[in-house]
Amino acid sequence: MTLNLCVLTPNRIVWDSEVKEIILSTNTGQIGVLPNHAPIATAVDIGILRIRLNDQWLTMALMGGFARIGNNEITILVNDAEKGSDIDPQEAQETLELAEANLRKAEGKRQTIEANLALRRARTRVEAINAIS
């Protein structure tokens, strides 16, 4: 038995295919979803989506949003998403280093919050690459 997974951003469909299992980062922690999972709606945190296709695991960096799970259908609506295999490792590492530097230089509450969010997004992209290596 499989699940139909659809990952959408405002600009595109990132994934629309059958999967065996997913592990999703939510605002309350990670959840695993197998076929016949109880219906839920949840907020999606900035984090990694792990997707199992048979014996192979893929990763995707998700940048926060919402998910609806029910009747073996998973719909994830996020601000942005990238497959781990599509992320350039060098560019992701450079972005992470820049985000860390920007956080150190941040002045005031607003700049600190924005720098922390940028750092979380950058770390998630690097984690998505490292999870598939």
UniProtKB/Swiss-Prot annotation:
GO terms for cellular component: chloroplast thylakoid membrane; proton-transporting ATP synthase complex. It comes from the Eukaryota. It is found in: Plastid, Chloroplast thylakoid membrane. SUPFAM superfamilies: Epsilon subunit of F1F0-ATP synthase N-terminal domain. Pfam families: ATP-synt_DE, ATP-synt_DE_N. Its main location: plastid. This is ATP synthase epsilon chain, chloroplastic.
